[in-house]
């Protein structure tokens, strides 16, 4: 049961407090990185404005950040508010912080591979960001054997594995977590990594194309976050089969459809090949073979998804 003091702090953190009264928040310990702590009124998220990420962080993530900072008051506060301290000892940097985490219920002797696998078993924005915070800039886990994670990374990334390899293992993991966020359309995690790693914008674009995430691809293109040659974009889209959404988007932007057909042939992607041939018929307005399902010049991702969600490739031999 929460103490009266804990309940009072929680209630205060949910209020909109004018700036002239911020000293009260500071006095009550509702202060972090020179900014007031706000708690979401309807969920277990802390609203932050002082880290590289501006937005809502789950209490579990905020707790790991506080542990890595050796901020004992916040460790106690976030734990009292319901944050899970299970992984705390994996990030505690001092003996005192380690002892505090133990008293609050942290698990001893966790293996880094077990942390990685258990958190990513359920791919949510919170778990992806939490995994990132546990491993990133963590002296306790700085010696990583990428063979421990290689099978999982290769299974998820497939062809993109050739673009992720880095001499610094933690850089490889950062790219991997970003890729998972894009692949599974985890908007909160995408926003987190976009704000935290602006030098990985090209990687985000590559992931959106390769994982058929036309919604993120459209956002990147509309906001002009980063630029890539349109035929290179189409090449990436064609490398993974059934990437109809991003192939179509690249086609509408002007990618060479004949070149795309050659790429699908080279990579033996049969469904993509049939789709690219349908797009070529659409471009040439071939009424005999063009699929009535396909419409030209649509860039709205919702309309593209609706148009293609029931698309089935038909072999040219059966036409």
Swiss-Prot record:
Task: From the UniProt record, list the coiled-coil ranges.
Answer: none
Q: What keywords were assigned to this record?
A: Early protein, Host cytoplasm, Host-virus interaction, Inhibition of host innate immune response by virus, Inhibition of host interferon signaling pathway by virus, Inhibition of host STAT1 by virus, Inhibition of host STAT2 by virus, Interferon antiviral system evasion, Viral immunoevasion
Q: What is its main location?
A: host cell
Instruction: List the induction conditions.
Output: Expressed in the early phase of the viral replicative cycle.
| Cellular component terms (Gene Ontology) | host cell cytoplasm
Q: Where in the cell is it found?
A: Host cytoplasm
The record's Gene Ontology biological-process terms are: symbiont-mediated suppression of host innate immune response; symbiont-mediated suppression of host JAK-STAT cascade via inhibition of STAT1 activity; symbiont-mediated suppression of host JAK-STAT cascade via inhibition of STAT2 activity; symbiont-mediated suppression of host type I interferon-mediated signaling pathway; taxis
Pfam entry (one): ASFV_360
Establish whether keyword Transmembrane is in the entry.
no
What's the stated role of this polypeptide? Plays a role in virus cell tropism, and may be required for efficient virus replication in macrophages. In addition, inhibits IFN-beta-induced IFN-stimulated genes (ISGs) transcription. Mechanistically, degrades host STAT1 and STAT2 through apoptosis and ubiquitin-proteasome pathways respectively.
The UniProt similarity line reads:
Belongs to the asfivirus MGF 360 family.
Kindly state the subunit structure of this protein.
Interacts with host STAT1; this interaction mediates STAT1 degradation through apoptosis. Interacts with host STAT2; this interaction mediates STAT2 degradation through the proteasome.
Q: What is this protein called?
A: Protein MGF 360-9L
Q: Which organism is it from?
A: African swine fever virus (isolate Pig/Kenya/KEN-50/1950) (ASFV)
- Which lineage do the record's taxonomy fields give for this organism? Viruses, Varidnaviria, Bamfordvirae, Nucleocytoviricota, Pokkesviricetes
